[in-house]
Structures are given as C-alpha cells and as structure tokens.
Amino acid sequence: MKRFLLWIISVALGVALLLAAVMGVSYAFTTQGGCPDAAAQFGGQELETNGFCWQVPLLGGRLDKVFASPATLTVQKLGTLYTAHPDITLPDWASYTTLTIQTAVGSVVFAGSVSEYQSFLFPANGEYKAEMTLWRVPKGGMATQFEGGSTGALRKNLGLERPAKPTGWYRYSFRFTLQASADIAFSAERVEQGGIVGVRISGMTGDTAPAVETDLGSVQCVRAADGWRAYIPAAYNASSGGHAVNVAVNGETLTHTLVVLPKDFGTVEVDPEPAATDAANAEFRNAVWGLYEAPAREKLWAGGFVNPAENSMTLVDYGQVKVTNGQQGSRSNSTKLYTIPGEPCRAPANGVVVLARNLALTGNTVVIDHGAGMRSYLYGLQAIAVSEGQTVEKGQAVGALGEELTMDYKLGSKSVNPWLLFQTAGGLFWKENG
C-alpha cells in the first residue's frame, strides 16, 4: 500500500511538472504579437497607439496573459484636415468604442461612440484634440469585466467564447486643425420652365442652414445625410436666360448661374370662369398663402410621385395659355383633371397634411407638405378623409374625387410641372440617397 501511495504521488508530481512545463512553454511563446492589429485611421491618416492593455489566451483559453503599455502625454499631430467630417476607419475586431473631441481650450464638443460620431457636425473650423479607445470585448461580455494589469500578469479567462480570443483595448490621442470649405453641386446647369434644380451643399461645419437666394423663388435648405439640400423651381413663367443663385455658407457667399430654357406649353379653350367673391378670395388667402413661405420640414418623399387620380383626362394642363371666346388669357399654374366621382384621391407622395377643409373658392381642399418646401395642393374633392397634422403615405387615399380635380404642385410659392414629378424626372430626385 505504501508503495502504491508513493507511486500515486510520483505520478501526480509528474503530471504537475508536465503541466507546469506546458504552461511555461505556452507562456513563453505567447507574445505581444498575439494582440490584434492596432490599425485605425482618422481623416485618412494612420493613428498611433498611446496606451493599450490586452489579455491574450493561454492553454486553450483557461488563462490570459496580459500585455500592457500605459498612456502617456504624447499627442499625435495630424496637421490640417480639409474635410468637414473626417472619416474614421476602424479595425474589424472593434466592438466597443469611445471618442471624445474637444477644442483647443478644452471645451468638449463631442463625447460618444464612433457610430454616434457619424452624425456629428463640428461647430466651426479650428484646432481640436481627440482621444479614442477601441475595445474588443467577447459577445455577451462588458468592458467593466476586463481586469487588465501589467505586462506578464495572468488572469482567468472569462470563458465567453470558443475558441478564446484576445480581449482588451488600444487608446489613441491626436490633434488636428479643421479647415473645411463648403462644396456646392447643382443637378443641372440648365432647366426648362416647369422644372426643378437640386442643390447639394456639403463640406461645411456648424448646424446653421445655408442661405440660398435667387429671383426664381424662395428657397429653403433642409438637412441631408451629406450636409444640406435645397430645390430651386423654374416656374412656367420664369424668364428665360441666366439667373444668379447666391449661396451664403460659413461666412462666404458663392454665386452660380442657372439658365432657364423656354418651353411652349400650348393653349387650351376654356369657358369663362365666374368671378369669385371678395370673401372667398380672402378666405383662400388666409388659409393657403401662409403655407407658401412656411418653414421647410425634412424631406419626406422617396422616389417619384403618383397622380392623385388613377383614372383621369386632362382638361387644362400646367403652363397652358387659357383661351376664352378667342381671347388669350392667363397661363395656368395648375392642372385640371376630369375624374371619376367617388374614386380615391391619392396622396402623391409621403407627407404631412397641413390643410384639410372646405373653402368657398376651391371646394374641399387638401394640402400635403412633402418636405423641403415641396407641397401638393389638391382642390375640388368630393369628400375629405384626412385631418390636419396627419401623416400620409404615397398612394394613401386622402379623400374621394369629384367630377374635376385641380392639382397644383409648388416649391414654396412657385408652381412646377406635375408630369415631371410623376415621371421621377428632374432635380427633385437627384442623388436622393446621397
């Protein structure tokens, strides 16, 4: 029995020595090279690490070996960056990130994750300092579970993933000077009467909307993923030739010239229209005119518009000169359709109903705001099925059609050609998704 016990003890000691040897070899051969690649970029420039701590698995993930370097006061200088929103490129392994950006005097302008940074706008050009930490944490784990330590220390692996992988972080400290200049692009240099020109303004700092001025109409800018968007109307009666467009942004004014081309919309015979009463005109002005210059909401439409009347015949078209008893009169800023009573009147595009009521001048009236100053004015419905403030989707019934529907599509106060909207043509749909 004594010999057997001695044998058991010797075997156990041998196994322990073998495990110790294996662990020693594993420990010795586990080097800093087992840490993930630290490659990260800001504004297209490679960032240098300023401190790290990693736990690299040993023995199949039962233990971790620590590799660490403390952060220092060193700050990498990136120089001058000329884009308003420098891109951040991360390594594939980064699962949790923190980023802090402050001005030269220490005021924090951003604190959050790298994904949240994507929607951040720098308040102004100038000098900035940033600190970024990139973590690799196992799925189901948290950064607070990370023990860390000094190089060479052993830690118990969390056991949250198989095979076990390194867990830890790299820190980056860098400073840069932002010197961005606005970039303005137009969907076209020339536009026919009735058309729309899209404007994209990018590469600017701050959240103050650019100001666009032109004699073609009132233009408002709205936020977009790449900066700001605006839409310029060339109404049926816009004078042909060059029109200056002045864009004020970041303290500078840039001037561009758009050329309006004439278009022959033809003529149409119409019956004399009865004169409206002063009361009806006043009611219409009070209800509708204020919408022309109302603040623009975010862009809500997506893709082309649909004709509110699925089945119709055109009686008076946009831009046509109305002829009564052989005498030429005014040009039509709207389109009048012969429609089938009782059929649905459809929302031309996504939007918000801003007017839904009966008016003496135009009958049952629905106005839908599609954002960016673009609105649909629908007159003469048999019945109204929506209320003011209601959100509607393209094709949704907003009421029932009568015998005639008058539709007017305006950017601000200027009417545009509806058929271009139905054909998804022109600047309203230019680079819709960026």
Ranges and model annotations:
Residues 1-18:
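N-terminal Sec-pathway targeting helices
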Residues 366-369, 390-434:
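Conserved, short, structured surface segments that act as functional micro-motifs
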Residues 169-171, 177-257:
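Cationic-aromatic interfacial patches
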Residues 119-129, 234-241:
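Surface-exposed, short loops/turns at beta-strand junctions within beta-sandwich domains
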Residues 333, 347-382, 404-408:
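Zn2+-dependent peptidoglycan hydrolase active-site motif and core
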Residues 344-354, 386-401:
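Short, well-structured beta-strand-loop connectors
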Residues 257-362:
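Surface-exposed, glycine-biased beta-strand/turn segments
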Residues 154-163, 177-192, 260-287:
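Low-complexity, Pro/Ser/Thr- and charge-rich linker/hinge segments at domain boundaries
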